Amino acid sequence: MVKIGVHVSIAGSIARAVERAMAIDCDTFQIFSRNPRGWTFKPLAEEDAALFQGALGTSGIGPAVVHMPYLPNLASPKEEIWRKSVEALTEELHRCSMLDVPYLVTHLGHHMGEGIGAGEGRVQQAIDAAFSQSDPGSSRVMLLLENTAGEKNSVGSRFEEIGRIRESCSDPDRIGVCMDTCHAFAAGYDLRNEVGLSRTLEAFEDGIGIEHLHVIHLNDAKADIGSHLDRHTHIGLGMIGEEGCSGILTHPTLASLPFICETPEDAVRDNAANIRAVRRLAVPRA
C-alpha cells in the first residue's frame, strides 16, 4: 500500500499533529517542529516530545517527517546568516532526535550571486558543522536534501548538485534526498508521462543514486516545465497532470516511499480531498 500524507499543523501542541494526520486518513505526515517564520524558538519540552512519541506509537502511521524552518540559508555567503542557519539545523536535528522522527528535510538555500560552486561549498560546510555540533542521539536522524525549482541563485535544482554536496560531506551516510515533484518539473525534469519519468529517474540515479531517495513531496505544478517557478497546485490538476502523478505513485522504484503533499487548501480541494485524489491515482492503471 502506498503511504500518503500531508503537512499538518502543530498548533496547540506538537502531539496534536498526530491527531490531525489521523483525522484526514494520513499514512505518513510532515510537520514543522516550531514556528517556521522566525529565528527564535522555545526549547522542546521533554513532556511534549514524550506525548508526541506516545501518540505516534499508538496511531499506526508513519514515518513522521520534520521540515526545517523557512529562514535558514545554508548556502549564504553572509557569515551571520550562515552561522544562524547552522544553529537552526543543529537544533532541528536535536528536536527530531527527541521526537524519534527519522527524517529532517532541508532546503539548500541561495548563494546570493557567489556562484553555484561557492553555494555548494557553503552547504557542505554547514552540514558538517551541524553534524559535529549535534548531540550523539541526532546521529539517528537522516538529513534529507530537497531539490529546488531553480529560482535565481538557488542551490540544488539539478540532481548532480545535490549529489556533489552529499558526497563532499564528512558523513554522507547520514544524508539522503527528498524529491519535490513540482520543484523537479519546474527545474526542467519531465514527469508528465512514462518516458519523461524514466528519464528523470535515470538522471537521479546518475546524479545522486536512487537508493538515497527516502521521501517524495508529491505536488502538482501550476507553472510549465522549466519555468523555475515554485507554484504548487492540487494533485492531478496541474501541468504534471493525472497521468504524471499516477505514474509517479505506481512506479516500482517509488511506490514504497512515503508521499507527502504540500498542496493548497482552498475552494477547489482541502487536504483530505487531495489525499483521496492521490489514493485514486495510486491504483495501477490497467
UniProtKB/Swiss-Prot annotation:
Enzyme Commission number(s): 3.1.21.2
Which top EC class is named for this enzyme in its record? hydrolase
**Nuclease recorded as keyword:** yes
Disulfide topology: none
Q: Which PROSITE patterns match?
A: AP_NUCLEASE_F2_2 (PS00730), AP_NUCLEASE_F2_3 (PS00731), AP_NUCLEASE_F2_4 (PS51432)
Recorded hits in InterPro entries, A to Z, give:
AP_endonuc_2, AP_endonuc_F2_Zn_BS, Xyl_isomerase-like_sf, Xyl_isomerase-like_TIM-brl
Listed GO molecular functions? deoxyribonuclease IV (phage-T4-induced) activity; DNA binding; DNA-(apurinic or apyrimidinic site) endonuclease activity; phosphoric diester hydrolase activity; zinc ion binding
**Residues engaged in binding Zn(2+) 1:** 67, 107, 146
Which residues are recorded as binding Zn(2+) 2? 146, 180, 217, 262
Alphabetic keyword roster: DNA damage, DNA repair, Endonuclease, Hydrolase, Metal-binding, Nuclease, Zinc
Q: Which GO terms describe its biological process?
A: base-excision repair
**Highest taxon of the lineage:** Archaea
* Cofactor entry: Zn(2+)
| Function per UniProt | Endonuclease IV plays a role in DNA repair. It cleaves phosphodiester bonds at apurinic or apyrimidinic (AP) sites, generating a 3'-hydroxyl group and a 5'-terminal sugar phosphate.
As for family, the record states: Belongs to the AP endonuclease 2 family.
Q: What is this protein called?
A: Probable endonuclease 4
The gene designation is: nfo
